[in-house]
């Protein structure tokens, strides 16, 4: 560092080198004066250099990299400059500084080469992508061939100067295009243009100008100049300010119309006309290697170039024209190439229209592209995003997608949800296509002079049992307010969500001109059982015979003799408690299906069920016993089912058997046999000896032939559930009788409120079957629950139909259980009155049976036992073993568990012992019903019976201290006894009812009783109101237990 007095003396340095000074070189950079203070108290004034850091990179799409030839031409002046001045004469730099500068220049050159390589790679990609645009550009290329002329290469820039300013790049080679596709060159890319003007002769670069000197306004010939933006040092390092010159188009936002679609090849812009703009090298990115200095004085000043700083005033503001641009394909990526534009006019000349853009742009459309007002992928040159947003929000009439200040712009130009729908206020301002369509329709209606008449369309409206006003309006395609107005005119005030019945809904629909089709929930049952078969498809089937009669008259033994089996010996108590179905193959090859019904009175429903599904009835009557009550009941069931009867007089092998007695007893019930001129056949049989069995079979086959029993086996199966049970290991097992069609394995069956797919078919001998034809009894496995005996079953087409049917039936069953009808029905008031009177008592029970039919028989018998005072309340009934859940349910209800032919599991037994729940097992229905009848009888209130003893009259009343009142009486009738019940009557009014004679004395001695005619003293428990003349009636009360009938 030198003193300021040594400045300007070149010879003072002994080495011949120029002194190192902080003074700025003339015309290079701006300088300033700074006073330094040292620790020893000395001060010194030094001159410092003011540098402006410009870490901006050139715009990638506007400036081309110099070719290799240009780099060689640019390197020569630098070498001459460095060698001519020696080691220190070139700008006053030392050898180390020069080496450092050379290294920086080489690094900059390598950086430019890398950029050129990247451009060439991008050009190669763009060439393949521009194939689609060649056809459109070929038409303009033909007109451009005649006017196209190649432009000469621009000279290289002179040697650099020490000033830290960026180099001026060599001018890119501009050639006339042959085709619209970009051509790859080793130096700079050649842009396609319809007519490129001839480039000017190269001019030497002007000397560097001080950056702080004022700059004149640009001339008319200098149209555009790219200069790094001073306002965006902190925003984007590669942003360049685009400043227009005089005669340039107006600044501000670009037109908001759609741009031409299609991708533009990377960096394939049209050749620039002659002029000084765009003649500078790209500036390095911030933090990159420093560029070499400009050469000083190479070629002298360019007089045509304005010097000095640019005007510091604001740029021209305002919006650009708002006309629409031709539609173009939306570029979703910021790196996607742009379509090749047309050639630009010369400086100061008039600008032609862009390719595809009309001369006069139309007005802005009603719906603008949501991405139109967003910045370009590369960003506007020299403009901050905040300024762009402010200007475009204030000036652009289109819908702009909002973006927070300082938000990243890397996704600009991409199609996103925010771009389409907007956010915040922009989403509220965005008009939908439907809104625009409605606006257009309103305009058309205004031009036509009013809205067009709406033609009402008559529809078929489906109306269920109940429907809301809203649903009715939807089905009629009418506004709900119109229906409400109509109902108001009819005097009905309803809201949109109110429910109306089907009659009102039909009236409304008819008033509006629609046709009505009424449906109901019960319509799901339609088609469950198929239609009747055509006679041409019918084939003979086996007869179904039901054996009925009184208990212990030999029905099962007779079937065993016919089947040559022994079923009766295995039954509990020797009686049948289940309905059985068997198919017997006769010696002739014919088949007969037999149904065995129980004879006990409890199984009345089973007998009725068997009579309804049979073709004929065999009425078994014991020859030694005659007609019994269940025999009469069987006759009634057969008549109700309108089926013929064959009377079989059994046990004819016994000595006391008399068939004539049986015939006479049947006459009392209007059963006339053939021997007496009737139509009922009678056969004398013996199941033990086999007497008359063949004749019985002949009568059955003859009657079946007369009845001409036929069915169609080639249709879907349907029939009746005979019995059902829950078997451990097999699940729900149902015994069904197929009436029509053929039941196959895999069919979907609906039985009552249960459905499932048939997994197995078993006959009475437990043999697997693949199918079961008409009049065949089988056991089916696969249902999801145990159906009720007597329920019809049918095969449906799919599970959806089966589920629809079962859900409807379950809903009906639940509604019936919630609202019972008949004898068991009672209102809440009646039940509360009975509970308050303590006269209504219930016995809760949980019943589990082996089959569903037995459970129904038990429940029916218990219902018959009920009276107005006591009744059995069934908490749960079902088929299957007793489980732990049954035990817990019985504990909660305080009910005993009844098991009929079933047992409890080990876990259920242990749980019942811990919880104190009683489990009772029964195998015969007699025992079960007798025990339950005894329990219900014990719950009945006993009958109180009075026994008269005697009367006494009160002669005098004594009031004794510490004792109370004592009545002095005389026994007038009978005898009075100590401890007996008394009734005190005064003036024919009972004063005390059911009092107790506590003390009885004769004179001073207590006596047990006093006979008639004697006097005594009496004192009553809890009663002191004794007066002379009262009559005392003495009696005893006896309680007698009641029994159910």
From Swiss-Prot:
Gly residues composition-biased segments: 83-94
Top-rank taxon, per record: Bacteria
Listed CDD domains: IF2_eIF5B, IF2_mtIF2_II, mtIF2_IVc
UniProt-annotated location(s): Cytoplasm
Biased composition (Low complexity): 124-151, 184-199, 352-363
Region (Disordered) residue spans: 1-169, 184-451
The keyword Coiled coil belongs to this UniProt entry's keyword annotation: no
InterPro entries: EF-G-like_DII (IPR053905), EFTu-like_2 (IPR004161), IF2_assoc_dom_bac (IPR013575), IF2_II (IPR044145), IF2_N (IPR006847), P-loop_NTPase (IPR027417), Small_GTP-bd (IPR005225), T_Tr_GTP-bd_dom (IPR000795)
Annotated segments matching region G3: 596-599
Composition bias, Basic and acidic residues: 103-123, 227-237, 302-323, 381-393, 438-450
One Pfam family cited in the UniProt record for this chain: EF-G_D2
Ligand binding (GTP): 549-556, 596-600, 650-653
Region (G5): 686-688
Chain positions covered by the region annotation G1: 549-556
Keywords carried by this UniProt record: Cytoplasm, GTP-binding, Initiation factor, Nucleotide-binding, Protein biosynthesis
Pro residues bias: start-end ranges: 152-163, 338-348
Family statement: Belongs to the TRAFAC class translation factor GTPase superfamily. Classic translation factor GTPase family. IF-2 subfamily.
Protein task: One of the essential components for the initiation of protein synthesis. Protects formylmethionyl-tRNA from spontaneous hydrolysis and promotes its binding to the 30S ribosomal subunits. Also involved in the hydrolysis of GTP during the formation of the 70S ribosomal complex.
HAMAP family (alphabetical): IF_2_B
Name used for this protein in its record: Translation initiation factor IF-2
Organism: Caulobacter sp. (strain K31)
């Amino acid at each position: 560092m030198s003193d300021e007095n040594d400045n300007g003396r070149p010879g003072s340095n002994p080495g011949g080198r120029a002194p190192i000074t902080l003074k700025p070189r003339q015309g290079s950079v701006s300088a300033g004066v700074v006073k330094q203070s040292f620790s020893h108290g000395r001060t010194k004034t030094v001159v410092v250099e003011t540098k402006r850091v410009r870490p901006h990179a050139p715009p990638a799409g506007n400036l081309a990299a110099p070719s290799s030839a240009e780099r060689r031409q640019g390197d020569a002046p630098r070498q001459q400059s460095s060698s001519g001045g020696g080691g220190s004469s070139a700008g006053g730099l030392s050898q180390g500084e020069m080496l450092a500068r050379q290294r920086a220049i080489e690094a900059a050159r390598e950086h430019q080469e890398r950029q050129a390589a990247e451009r060439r790679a991008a050009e190669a990609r763009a060439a393949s992508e521009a194939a689609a645009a060649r056809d459109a550009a070929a038409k303009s290329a033909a007109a451009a061939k005649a006017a196209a002329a190649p432009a000469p290469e621009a000279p290289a820039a002179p040697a650099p100067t020490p000033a830290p300013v960026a180099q001026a790049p060599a001018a890119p080679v501009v050639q006339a295009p042959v085709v619209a596709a970009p051509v790859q060159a080793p130096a700079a890319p050649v842009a396609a243009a319809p007519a490129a003007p001839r480039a000017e002769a190269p001019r030497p670069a002007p000397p560097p100008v001080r950056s702080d000197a004022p700059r004149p306004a640009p001339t008319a010939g200098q149209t555009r100049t790219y200069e790094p933006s001073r306002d965006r040092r902190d925003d984007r390092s590669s942003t360049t300010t685009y400043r227009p010159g005089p005669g340039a188009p107006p600044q501000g936002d670009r037109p908001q119309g759609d741009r031409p679609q299609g991708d533009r090849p990377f960096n394939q812009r049209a050749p620039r006309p002659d002029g000084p703009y765009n003649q500078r090298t790209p500036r390095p990115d911030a933090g990159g290697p420093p560029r070499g200095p400009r050469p000083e004085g190479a070629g002298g000043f360019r007089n045509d170039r304005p010097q000095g700083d640019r005007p510091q005033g604001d740029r021209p503001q305002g919006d650009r024209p708002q006309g629409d641009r031709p539609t173009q394909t939306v570029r979703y990526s910021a790196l996607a190439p742009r379509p090749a534009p047309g050639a630009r006019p010369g400086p100061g000349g008039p600008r032609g229209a862009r390719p595809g853009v009309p001369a006069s742009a139309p007005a802005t459309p009603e719906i603008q592209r949501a991405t139109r007002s967003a910045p370009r992928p590369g960003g506007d040159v020299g403009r901050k995003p905040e300024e762009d947003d402010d200007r475009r929000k204030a000036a652009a009439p289109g819908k702009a997608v909002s973006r927070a200040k300082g938000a990243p712009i890397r996704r600009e130009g991409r199609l996103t949800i925010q771009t389409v729908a907007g956010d915040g206020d922009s989403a509220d301002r965005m008009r939908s296509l439907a809104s625009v369509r409605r606006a257009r329709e309103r305009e058309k209606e205004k031009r036509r002079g009013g809205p067009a008449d709406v033609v009402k369309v008559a529809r078929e409206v489906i109306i269920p049992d109940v429907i809301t006003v809203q649903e009715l309006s939807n089905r009629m395609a009418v506004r709900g307010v119109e229906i409400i107005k109509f109902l108001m005119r009819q005097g009905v005030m309803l809201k949109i969500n109110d429910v109306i019945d089907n009659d009102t809904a039909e009236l409304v629909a008819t008033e509006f001109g629609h046709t009505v089709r009424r449906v109901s929930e019960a319509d799901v049952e339609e088609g469950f059982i198929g239609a009747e078969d055509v006679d041409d498809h019918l084939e003979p089937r086996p007869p179904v015979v039901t054996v009925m009669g009184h208990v212990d008259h030999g029905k099962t033994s007779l079937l065993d003799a016919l089947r040559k089996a022994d079923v009766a010996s295995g039954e509990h108590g020797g009686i049948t408690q289940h309905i059985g179905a068997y198919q017997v193959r006769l010696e002739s090859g014919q088949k007969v299906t037999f149904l065995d019904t129980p004879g006990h009175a409890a199984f009345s429903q089973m007998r009725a069920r068997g009579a309804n599904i049979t073709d004929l009835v065999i009425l078994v009557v014991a020859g030694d016993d005659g007609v019994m009550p269940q025999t009469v009941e069987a006759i009634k069931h057969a008549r109700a089912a309108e089926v013929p009867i064959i009377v079989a007089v059994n046990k004819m092998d016994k000595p006391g058997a008399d068939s004539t007695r049986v015939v006479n007893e049947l006459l009392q019930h209007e059963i006339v046999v053939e021997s007496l001129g009737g139509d009922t056949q009678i056969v004398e049989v013996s199941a033990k000896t086999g007497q008359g069995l063949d004749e019985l079979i002949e009568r059955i086959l003859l009657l079946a032939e007369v009845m001409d029993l036929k069915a169609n086996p080639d249709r879907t199966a349907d029939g009746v559930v005979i019995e059902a049970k829950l078997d451990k290991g097999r699940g729900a097992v149902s015994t069904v009788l197929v009436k029509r069609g053929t039941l196959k394995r895999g069919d979907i069956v609906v039985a009552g409120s249960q459905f499932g797919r048939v997994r197995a078919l078993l006959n009475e001998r437990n043999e697997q079957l693949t199918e079961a034809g008409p009049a065949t009894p089988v056991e089916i496995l696969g249902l999801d629950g145990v159906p009720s005996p007597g329920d019809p079953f049918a095969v449906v087409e799919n599970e959806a139909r089966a589920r629809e049917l079962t859900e409807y039936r379950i809903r009906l069953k639940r509604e019936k259980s919630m609202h019972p009808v008949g004898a068991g029905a009672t209102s809440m008031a009646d039940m509360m009155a009975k509970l308050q009177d303590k006269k209504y008592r219930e016995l809760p029970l949980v019943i589990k049976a082996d089959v569903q039919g037995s459970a129904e028989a038990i429940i029916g018998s218990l219902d018959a036992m009920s009276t107005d005072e006591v009744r059995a309340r069934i908490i749960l009934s079902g088929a299957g073993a007793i489980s732990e859940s049954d035990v817990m349910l019985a504990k909660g209800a305080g009910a005993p568990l009844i098991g009929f032919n079933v047992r409890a599991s080990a876990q259920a037994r242990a749980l019942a012992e811990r919880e104190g729940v009683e489990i009772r097992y029964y195998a015969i229905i007699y025992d079960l019903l007798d025990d339950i009848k005894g329990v219900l009888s014990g719950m009945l209130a006993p009958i109180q019976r009075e026994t008269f003893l005697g009367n006494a009259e009160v002669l005098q009343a004594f009031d004794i201290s510490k004792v109370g009142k004592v009545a002095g009486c005389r026994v007038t009738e009978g005898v009075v006894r100590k401890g007996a019940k008394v009734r005190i009557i005064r003036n024919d009014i009972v004063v005390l009812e059911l009092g107790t004679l506590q003390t009885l004395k004769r004179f001073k001695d207590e006596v047990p009783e006093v006979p008639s005619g004697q006097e005594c003293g009496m004192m009553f428990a809890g009663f002191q109101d004794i007066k002379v003349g009262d009559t005392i009636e003495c009696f005893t009360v006896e309680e007698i237990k009641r029994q159910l009938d």
